[in-house]
Regions:
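Basic/polar N-terminal segments that are highly enriched at the extreme N-terminus
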Residues: 1-3
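A short glycine-rich, His/Asp/Glu-containing loop-to-beta-strand
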Residues: 12-46, 134-178
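Fe(II)/2-oxoglutarate oxygenase catalytic core
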Residues: 26-31, 46, 54, 80-81, ...
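Short amphipathic beta-strand/extended segments with alternating polar/hydrophobic composition
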Residues: 48-49, 69-77, 119-123
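Glycine- and acidic-residue-biased ligand/ion/polar-headgroup-sensing regions
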Residues: 50-70, 167-169, 173-174, 178, ...
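Ligand-binding loop in jelly-roll beta-barrel domains
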Residues: 73, 78-118
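Double-stranded beta-helix
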Residues: 103-143
Length: 186
């Protein structure tokens, strides 16, 4: 598969939605739908996709997740200083997000008909670790956490995590062909 455009400058629309990629835009080779939402206090958004798994990652703010018969109120100052909260659900499961303060979330979806148990990933489930320490004069060193991948959630067709580079270091990732090969082969 040939990759098309790999970088752009998306912006939020007047409803607080920023589209990063869809199945049919210029980044369609990613085979995912990824969007970021800015929410005001009291705002409610619902996410439910048939034939797709969905992950809702808190980037910053204070909000309440509601899914199936469960509720969890979570908060995160920002992606740089506090751990991540993420709900991951299979096809057809509704996730309701209520912003208790100004909140920003990332919603990532991909096609997947497999049914699996919904899971709320807490900060302690995906601790930060360092990658590429000492490589390339140590300019590739970065903090990474894997929220889920094929090893953590074998039923998933997605990988979700965060990467933080130290100032002045390269942005990007060294290719891990094993993980990405597994994802592409599904």
């Amino acid at each position: 598969m040939e990759l098309g455009k790999v970088f752009g400058y998306p912006e939020f629309d007047d409803k607080g939605e920023m589209i990063l990629t869809t199945y049919d835009n210029e980044y369609q080779a990613m085979m995912m739908d990824i969007r970021v939402y800015q929410m005001k206090a009291g705002e409610v958004r619902k996410f439910q996709r048939q034939g797709e798994e969905t992950a809702v990652l808190l980037l910053s703010g204070n909000m309440t997740y509601a899914w199936e018969d469960q509720r969890e109120t979570v908060s995160r100052k920002d992606v740089f200083t506090e751990g991540r909260w993420c709900i991951h659900v299979s096809s057809g499961v509704e996730v309701e997000v209520t912003a208790n303060a100004e909140t920003e979330i990332l919603v990532q979806c991909t096609r997947n008909d497999r049914t699996f148990a919904s899971r709320l990933y807490r900060p302690e489930d995906a601790p930060w670790g360092y990658s590429s320490v000492g490589k390339f004069g140590n300019v590739a060193k970065r903090r990474v956490n894997t929220i889920f991948d094929h090893d953590i959630s074998p039923e998933s067709n997605m990988v979700l995590g965060e990467v933080l580079n130290d100032r002045g270091n390269w942005s990007g990732r060294s290719e891990d062909r094993r993980v990405w090969k597994e994802c592409r082969s599904r």
